[in-house]
Amino acid sequence: MARTKQTARKSTGGKAPRKQLATKAARKTPATGGVKKPHRYRPGTVALREIRKYQKSTELVIRKLPFQRLVREIAQDFKTDLRFQSQAVLALQEAAEAYLVGLFEDTNLCAIHAKRVTIMPKDIQLARRIRGERA
């Protein structure tokens, strides 16, 4: 901000009478009409907290029922009226999540190698190409 010069003002006399101290309730409400601004963390703080949380835990990240519907939908293309044991669907989900976690780790390394912190589709493509999954 640009600095501005202060102009001299004529005083109107002696000291003004002292005001009474405000009550605690009046002091706590802000001067902007009593609407308190909600607390917000800085960008990236919550993301880092989530990363640490999910790295510590071992539970499945994808919800079970949507994954089961996806498995059944894909299986319909190969054979109709297929039945799945619940353990088979859980095994598929474990394998799928392990694969995705590994892929995202490699993708992140590709992004870091390109001096970026944001992963992009080209990072996933490069990671898969290096792995030999996609020519």
Curated annotation (Swiss-Prot):
It comes from the Eukaryota. SUPFAM superfamilies: Histone-fold. The modification Phosphothreonine is found at T12. Acetylation is generally linked to gene activation. Acetylated to form H3K9ac (11%), H3K14ac (17%), H3K18ac (11%), H3K23ac (16%) and H3K27ac (7%). H3K4, H3K35 and H3K36 are not acetylated. H3K4me prevents acetylation. 32% of the histone H3 are acetylated with, on average, 2.4 acetyl-Lys. They are all continuously deacatylated and re-acetylated with a half-life of approximately 2 minutes. Monomethylated to form H3K4me1 (81%), H3K9me1 (16%), H3K27me1 (25%), H3K35me1 (25%) and H3K36me1 (5%). No methylation at H3K14, H3K18 and H3K23. Methylated by a protein complex that includes Mut11. Set1 methylates specifically H3K4. H3K4me1 is associated with silenced euchromatin. Set3 forms H3K9me1, while H3K9me2 is undetected. H3K9me1 is specifically associated with silent, multi-copy transgenes. Its main location: nucleus. One of its GO terms (cellular component) is nucleus. Residues 1-40 are annotated as: Disordered. The record marks K5, K36, K37 as: Not N6-acetylated. The modification Phosphoserine is found at S11. Keywords: Acetylation, Chromosome, DNA-binding, Methylation, Nucleosome core, Nucleus, Phosphoprotein. The record marks K15, K19, K24 as: Not N6-methylated. The modification N6-acetyllysine is found at K10, K15, K19, K24, K28. Signal peptide: none annotated. The modification N6-methyllysine is found at K5, K10, K28, K36, K37. GO terms for molecular function: DNA binding; protein heterodimerization activity; structural constituent of chromatin. The keyword Membrane does not apply. It is found in: Nucleus; Chromosome. InterPro entries: Histone-fold, Histone_H2A/H2B/H3, Histone_H3/CENP-A. Belongs to the histone H3 family. PANTHER family: HISTONE H3. Core component of nucleosome. Nucleosomes wrap and compact DNA into chromatin, limiting DNA accessibility to the cellular machineries which require DNA as a template. Histones thereby play a central role in transcription regulation, DNA repair, DNA replication and chromosomal stability. DNA accessibility is regulated via a complex set of post-translational modifications of histones, also called histone code, and nucleosome remodeling. The nucleosome is a histone octamer containing two molecules each of H2A, H2B, H3 and H4 assembled in one H3-H4 heterotetramer and two H2A-H2B heterodimers. The octamer wraps approximately 147 bp of DNA. This is Histone H3 type 1. It comes from Chlamydomonas reinhardtii (Chlamydomonas smithii).
